[in-house]
Regions:
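Short, basic alpha-helical nucleic acid-contact segments in DNA-binding proteins
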Residues: 1
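Single, function-defining residue in the core of a domain
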Residues: 5-10, 14-27, 35, 39-185
């Protein structure tokens, strides 16, 4: 079976969701709750999925504790693609706000993984504000303040390994008059 492609690429999207499950002591201990303190706990799982957008099926899914690192799970799922489906075609990964992470961007770029990520206005804020056009390659400098967050973590060596990285920022004008900024490599 020949899969549907976009410009010779498979198109994957990653996303996470919280799902209510039966509230039992075992589920609360194993998966946790997102309920506020002082309210009745509701057991939930955190579900991370990697979805083939054009062929319309889930490639990978992981069940996690309710509050989980969606980007870390997404990276693991992308890393498993060769064993999961035997990827022989180029692909790119679409991610929503909440996924942008400097270490994740660097790891994906180092591995040659193409991505498109919707940014929040606070992501690379100064670079977004300095955009002179709707489509620019921008140098993201790894300043002391950007690196500070990763000091003493597993990502310290990675963010210290370079002065910055080049990323393409694309502004998309929406029908309602708002704009979204996408980051891609």
């Amino acid at each position: 079976i020949t899969p549907y492609l976009y410009k010779e690429h498979l198109v994957f999207a990653v996303d996470g969701s919280d799902i209510n499950i039966p509230t039992t002591p075992e589920n609360l201990e194993r998966f946790g709750t997102a309920s506020r303190k002082g309210t009745k706990p509701q057991a939930q799982i955190g579900l991370g999925c990697l979805y083939d957008v054009l062929n319309r099926f889930i490639i990978e899914s992981d069940i996690n504790r309710v509050k989980f690192d969606e980007m870390k799970i997404a990276e693991q799922q992308v890393d498993r693609l060769p064993e999961t489906i035997g990827v022989t075609r180029p692909f790119f990964v679409i991610m929503d706000r909440g996924y942008p992470s400097i270490p994740s961007f660097l790891r994906m770029m180092d591995k040659g993984i193409k991505f498109v990520v919707r940014l929040k206005t606070s992501d690379f804020k100064s670079e977004q504000q300095a955009l002179a056009s709707d489509d620019e390659d921008v140098l993201i400098k790894l300043t002391k303040s950007r690196r500070y967050h990763y000091m003493g973590t597993e990502n310290e060596a990675l963010v210290m390994s370079r002065e910055g990285f080049l990323i393409r920022l694309i502004t998309v004008r929406l029908e309602n008059g708002n704009s979204e900024v996408l980051a891609t490599n």
